[in-house]
């Protein structure tokens, strides 16, 4: 489903306020805390044995920033999300072997983090637009999976 002009405006207006490093690190940290079995993808990140270690792990924070920056690319390519993420989908499928369900889980956590940090901006319509965006990004990232 494509985005209408109002949805594009809502997504863009909020995105310009987002602290990508902080929110990205928090989102990935939350995923690793809430879903500890996902830590297996990050075993080379050092100590991720508990919530405190995860929240203060520089590699987790840096990768969270990278992930959210990549998510932000979708904001710039709302009319071509699937094509934009084709190579990243291939990487996650063929090389990293990441369970595509993780994209949905992390997308939901990103929404929680954005809502917590930007409550005045994250109203019902903005939430709906971001939910649509998260679904499309997750589907694009899962596109190479069979």
Curated annotation (Swiss-Prot):
It holds the Pfam family Globin. The keyword Ribosomal protein does not apply. SUPFAM superfamilies: Globin-like. Belongs to the globin family. Residues 2-146 form the Globin domain. It comes from Crocodylus niloticus. Gene3D superfamilies: Globins. GO terms for biological process: hydrogen peroxide catabolic process. The modification N-acetylalanine is found at residue 1. This is Hemoglobin subunit beta. Red blood cells. Keywords: Acetylation, Heme, Iron, Metal-binding, Oxygen transport, Transport. GO terms for cellular component: blood microparticle; haptoglobin-hemoglobin complex; hemoglobin complex.
